[in-house]
Amino acid sequence: MNIYDQLQAVEDRYEELGELLSDPDVVSDTRRFMELSKEEASNRDTVIAYREYKQVLQNIVDAEEMIKESGGDADLEEMAKQELKDAKAEKEEYEEKLKILLLPKDPNDDKNIILEIRGAAGGDEAALFAGDLLTMYQKYAEAQGWRFEVMEASMNGVGGFKEVVAMVSGQSVYSKLKYESGAHRVQRVPVTESQGRVHTSTATVLVMPEVEEVEYDIDPKDLRVDIYHASGAGGQNVNKVATAVRIVHLPTNIKVEMQEERTQQKNREKAMKIIRARVADHFAQIAQDEQDAERKSTIGTGDRSERIRTYNFPQNRVTDHRIGLTLQKLDTILSGKLDEVMDALVLYDQTQKLEELNK
């Protein structure tokens, strides 16, 4: 099937989906309605671009016809030739754009995410850097018009984070932030360093797509739920009523503790969101590990402990090791202006996938 047949098939399917989504039987089936809605949304940009491309092709035909019928009118012929030139340039641009749009889509790209950041090697300095990363992602999310909610946080004594979990909601969140999973290294002089020596510390980031209950069922028998009293600073109980929740997924021993909310029900709901994402991610990672060759050909899906980026404060430098990108804009990037980095990662990923398709 050539590219034009593929595009026509996508448009035909898009129109079929529009009809299905107005079918009462589909509307009443929540799971099916969600699946079809997501499929329609994932094809929308391709269909819009294809329809615009067809208009450009028609513009070429019209311009060629105008040249033939100019009847010696030099001004008309010149105008038609310019229109033809512009339309042919547009045609090439659309063909490149459509090739990328036809690349296999990540089914999670449109999803919200669970973002986990942990201070790793480097003690207090690593925890402080985890806080810097949290602020960076918060500001980036704000610039994108996304909602950013801290769900769980474990702080250390100097204002850093041993671990922080956040929910980021909005349009195509996973498609942008999925490349952030991995080890982030910082090189700087800690505030506690009296000799002015540069120290190296690490924080790890994990990005998981949100998993809706209708998408991924966890057998209640596989869960152990403990209810206990929330504790404050120093470990004292701060609630007379037990509102904190610990959920353990027994087959994997994945556990989540939640005490941020005032009610047991809200803590339980948040804990279930996180554990559903972690369990789904756990099994997805196992499946991915079985496809090592494919995984290594793309970015953002490799070893979670892999060092992906270095933030060098003395040189105001950020280096993304996966694509060899170095920017002397550390202060700008940590303030949430991540577009240049994100765009480069997306472009690299698309280029790799195009090369795979052309082999």
Swiss-Prot record:
SUPFAM superfamilies registered for this protein in UniProt: Release factor
**Record Gene3D superfamilies:** 3.30.160.20, 3.30.70.1660, 6.10.140.1950
Write down which residues bear the modification named N5-methylglutamine.
Answer: Q236
Q: Which UniProt keywords apply?
A: Cytoplasm, Methylation, Protein biosynthesis
The compartments listed are: Cytoplasm
> Is Hydrolase tagged as a keyword?
no
Xref: Pfam families: PCRF, RF-1
Main location, first listed in the record: cytoplasm
Which is one Gene Ontology cellular component term of this protein?
cytoplasm
Which domain of life does this protein belong to?
Bacteria
One annotated GO molecular function: translation release factor activity, codon specific
| PTM remark | Methylated by PrmC. Methylation increases the termination efficiency of RF1.
Q: What does this protein do, in the record's words? A: Peptide chain release factor 1 directs the termination of translation in response to the peptide chain termination codons UAG and UAA.
State the similarity comment.
Belongs to the prokaryotic/mitochondrial release factor family.
| The protein, known as | Peptide chain release factor 1
Which taxonomic lineage is given here? Bacteria, Bacillati, Bacillota, Bacilli, Lactobacillales
Question: Which gene is the coding source of this polypeptide chain?
Answer: prfA
